[in-house]
């Protein structure tokens, strides 16, 4: 073995196997492309993305880590979301939650509802 060498096992790796998912249709109503990364709290994405937000609370895109989905102006596409894991606390992004997802995090406000 060479230091740093990877010896992958045979077969495929299924991402997020057995996890609950939500599928939403999302439209970019803005005049610029919007890109959303794999671990961004989807509930808090750019307000120009039009979709039913409440089912996206506590969810992220079901795509490989480090990748993103790009929404061109006027585009509409279907995305699959999976729940954020770990401590399920959200801070930053667009400051719509700022705390635990499964408890007392503040509710959404403003245009991003």
Swiss-Prot record:
Entry annotated with the keyword Zinc: no
UniProt key word Cytoplasm: yes
Recorded superkingdom: Bacteria
EC numbers: 3.5.1.5
Record's keyword terms, sorted: Cytoplasm, Hydrolase
GO MF annotations in UniProt: urease activity
Pathway: Nitrogen metabolism; urea degradation; CO(2) and NH(3) from urea (urease route): step 1/1
Any single biological process term in GO: urea catabolic process
Catalytic EC class: hydrolase
A cellular component annotation (GO) from this entry: urease complex
Catalysis: reaction(s): urea + 2 H2O + H(+) = hydrogencarbonate + 2 NH4(+)
Main location group: cytoplasm
Location(s) in or outside the cell: Cytoplasm
Cystine bridges: none
Binding partners and assembly: Heterotrimer of UreA (gamma), UreB (beta) and UreC (alpha) subunits. Three heterotrimers associate to form the active enzyme.
Family per record: Belongs to the urease beta subunit family.
HAMAP family referenced in this protein's UniProt entry, alphabetically: Urease_beta
Protein name, UniProt field: Urease subunit beta
Organism: Cyanothece sp. (strain PCC 7425 / ATCC 29141)
Gene this protein is translated from: ureB
């Amino acid at each position: 073995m060479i230091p740093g060498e990877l010896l992958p096992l045979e077969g495929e790796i299924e991402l997020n196997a057995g996890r609950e998912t939500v599928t939403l249709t999302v439209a970019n109503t803005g005049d610029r492309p919007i890109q959303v990364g794999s671990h961004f709290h989807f509930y808090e994405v750019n307000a120009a993305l039009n979709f039913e937000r409440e089912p996206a609370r506590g969810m992220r895109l079901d795509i490989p880590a480090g990748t993103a989905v790009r929404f061109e102006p006027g585009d509409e596409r279907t995305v699959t979301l999976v729940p954020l894991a770990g401590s399920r606390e959200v801070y930053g992004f667009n400051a719509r939650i700022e705390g635990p997802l499964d408890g007392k995090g503040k509710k959404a406000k403003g245009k991003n509802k």
